[in-house]
């Protein structure tokens, strides 16, 4: 695979290999055949980051080969959304002959949505001043004149200049209902929007008919908790990153959801609060004891759940676990399978043509 060529003819084979690999990894815990969710074969990534290489009068996007670390010029990137590809061409054309915008520019980050909005961040090794802002505004206006719905951001050390805003609003059809998700530049969002829809619909399907409330750790911008709110009486969710919490609060209002409560704290702190080990000012006015959480949802970082959180989730009759790293999922299952049984297993091909797999398991108490 090269950045400018996707081996689409190998899509089925690479997906089949992942299914076999996941089944083999899960064999100690379950004999289920994974439910398989396919990605679009191209234009599936909604975000991308590129270094910018200056070569005489020319400049262009590059990435580094993961093995050799050599530079690879990238003029088009079929893994990324069609909007990112349009913007890559337009940004280079707009910056190449503009000394103010190109000087010490070292990276461009793109974030796009299925609703055809974009935030583009230009990263610099220099101070950004009013002259930069004026030139950036002219570039933004020129891009919009090409019918590109784009917001530009300039970044340098301890500096962030938003020309308009640093977010875009995604609209996803999820099980017959449109969901609005605010996505903030430089915050985590699901990279493959088509796969995200399938993950949300699978999570809704496996929690159909759930009793009581839902607890979610690591909720981000509320991606899962807001979609799942329709299956539960109430949802209590934790998140540590301030921009993500603010986006989640916006998303609650935008989707007219009245049964979701977001708390800004780490999963480890929340465990202490639930166990009565510590009291937190942030929890004033929230009666944790009033929640009857029968289901816990976790979508942890690649490192998986720490041992304290493992113990905590075992207290819940139902565990829904989305994993971006099946190796740490299996490590967690060594503990969780002592008390819970795998009822559903899914493979989400979030990152086609790579070794990476995303998967989901539903566990119920034995």
Curated annotation (Swiss-Prot):
One of its GO terms (molecular function) is rRNA binding. GO terms for cellular component: cytosol. S-adenosyl-L-methionine binds at residues 190, 218, 223, 239, 299. It catalyses: uridine(54) in tRNA + S-adenosyl-L-methionine = 5-methyluridine(54) in tRNA + S-adenosyl-L-homocysteine + H(+); uridine(341) in tmRNA + S-adenosyl-L-methionine = 5-methyluridine(341) in tmRNA + S-adenosyl-L-homocysteine + H(+). Gene3D superfamilies: 2.40.50.1070, Vaccinia Virus protein VP39. It is an enzyme of class 2 (transferase). InterPro entries: MeTrfase_TrmA_AS (IPR030390), MeTrfase_TrmA_CS (IPR030391), SAM-dependent_MTases_sf (IPR029063), TrmA_MeTrfase (IPR011869), U5_MeTrfase_fam (IPR010280). GO terms for biological process: tRNA methylation. The active site is at residues 324, 358. Its EC number is 2.1.1.-, 2.1.1.35. It holds the Pfam family tRNA_U5-meth_tr. Dual-specificity methyltransferase that catalyzes the formation of 5-methyluridine at position 54 (m5U54) in all tRNAs, and that of position 341 (m5U341) in tmRNA (transfer-mRNA). NCBIfam families: trmA_only. HAMAP family: RNA_methyltr_TrmA. Belongs to the class I-like SAM-binding methyltransferase superfamily. RNA M5U methyltransferase family. TrmA subfamily. This is tRNA/tmRNA (uracil-C(5))-methyltransferase. The lineage of its organism: Bacteria, Pseudomonadati, Pseudomonadota, Gammaproteobacteria, Enterobacterales.
């Amino acid at each position: 695979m090269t950045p400018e060529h996707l081996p689409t003819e190998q899509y089925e084979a690479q997906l089949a290999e992942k299914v076999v690999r996941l089944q083999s990894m899960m064999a100690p815990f379950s004999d289920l055949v994974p439910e398989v969710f396919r990605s679009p074969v191209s234009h599936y990534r909604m975000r991308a980051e590129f270094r910018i290489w200056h070569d005489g009068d020319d400049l262009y996007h590059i990435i580094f080969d993961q093995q050799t670390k050599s530079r690879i010029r990238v003029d088009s990137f079929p893994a990324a959304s069609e909007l990112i590809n349009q913007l890559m061409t337009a940004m280079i054309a707009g910056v190449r002959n503009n000394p103010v915008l190109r000087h010490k520019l070292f990276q461009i980050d793109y974030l796009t949505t299925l609703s055809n909005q974009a935030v583009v961040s230009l990263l610099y090794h220099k101070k950004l001043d009013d002259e930069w802002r004026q030139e950036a505004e002219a570039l933004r206006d020129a891009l919009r004149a090409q019918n590109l719905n784009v917001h530009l951001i300039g970044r340098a050390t301890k500096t962030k200049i938003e020309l308009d805003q640093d977010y875009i609003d995604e609209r996803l059809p999820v099980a017959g209902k449109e969901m609005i998700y605010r996505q903030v530049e430089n915050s985590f969002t699901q990279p493959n929007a088509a796969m995200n829809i399938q993950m949300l619909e699978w999570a809704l399907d496996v929690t159909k008919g759930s009793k009581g409330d839902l607890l979610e750790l690591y909720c981000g911008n509320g991606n899962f908790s807001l979609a799942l709110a329709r299956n539960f009486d109430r949802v209590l969710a934790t998140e540590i990153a301030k921009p993500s919490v603010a986006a989640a609060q916006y998303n609650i209002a935008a989707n007219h959801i009245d049964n979701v409560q977001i708390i800004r704290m780490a999963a480890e702190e929340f465990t202490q609060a639930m166990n009565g080990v510590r009291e937190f000012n942030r929890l004033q006015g929230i009666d944790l004891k009033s929640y009857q959480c029968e289901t816990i949802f976790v979508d942890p970082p690649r490192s998986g759940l720490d041992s304290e959180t493992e113990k905590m989730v075992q207290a819940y009759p139902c565990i829904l676990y989305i994993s971006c790293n099946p190796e740490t999922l299996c490590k967690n299952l060594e503990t969780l399978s002592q008390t819970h049984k795998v009822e559903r297993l899914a493979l989400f091909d979030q990152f086609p043509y790579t070794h990476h797999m995303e998967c989901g398991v539903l566990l119920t108490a034995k």
